[in-house]
Regions:
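Short, intrinsically disordered, charge-balanced linker/junction segments flanking boundaries
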Residues: 185-191
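Structural signal for interior beta-strand "rungs" in well-ordered beta-sheet cores
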Residues: 3-184
Length: 191
């Protein structure tokens, strides 16, 4: 049976599985699905059309499934955020849903999002990836399996960071990053 704090707001169409915990002042909007054992700490928000698997932790002030930051987006569009299992979303993490009808921003399994990390619309974050404090993925980016973005790393729209790649902190890239490489600097790119 789900445990919902009396100050939390949960829309009647939201689906809460067994073992879900919703903390004080959290908000779960319409058409949200939450898998077994997932915990929303105080003040966490799951926006409409978000599906999140089992045993996830959504910490305070995280907003998952927010409207995409895309000027042409129509707020009535039924686009999605789909997150897998065993993920950790720490304080202030933001992940936007996709921009077009039926599309989704995708988060795999066992990802770790540190404070204030962000993924834009239509991003794909594969299994075991880590986003350190303040790192950001723009729209339509891909963060490969096991890749690590260090603190304050920016990945430009439509770029991908390959499997197992790791960044230097305070870096930015507007080019694709090869798998199993280290990258850093103001304009990191493939050599």
């Amino acid at each position: 049976m789900p445990k919902v704090h009396p100050t939390a707001i949960v829309h009647p169409t939201a689906v809460l599985s067994d073992g879900v915990e919703i903390g004080a002042y959290s908000i779960v909007e319409a058409d949200v699905v939450i898998g077994p054992g997932t915990v929303l700490r105080d003040h966490a928000i799951l926006r409409r059309y978000t599906t999140i698997g089992q045993n996830n932790i959504v910490d305070s002030y995280a907003v998952l499934g927010g409207l995409p930051q895309d000027l042409k987006f129509n707020p009535r569009t039924a686009s999605h955020l789909r997150a897998g299992d065993d993920n950790v979303f720490r304080e202030g993490v933001t992940i936007s849903r996709a921009t077009s009808e039926g599309e989704a921003t995708i988060v795999g399994n066992r990802t770790y999002w540190m404070t204030a990390a962000h993924a834009g619309h239509n991003a794909v974050v594969e299994d075991d990836a880590i986003l350190v404090n303040g790192s950001a993925l723009a729209g339509y980016t891909v963060l490969g399996r096991g890749a690590i973005l260090s603190a304050n790393v920016l990945v430009h729209q439509f770029c991908w960071v390959g499997e197992g790649a790791m960044s230097q902190g305070n870096s930015a890239t507007s080019m694709n990053i090869a798998p199993f490489t280290l990258f850093g600097g103001e304009q990191s790119c493939l050599p």
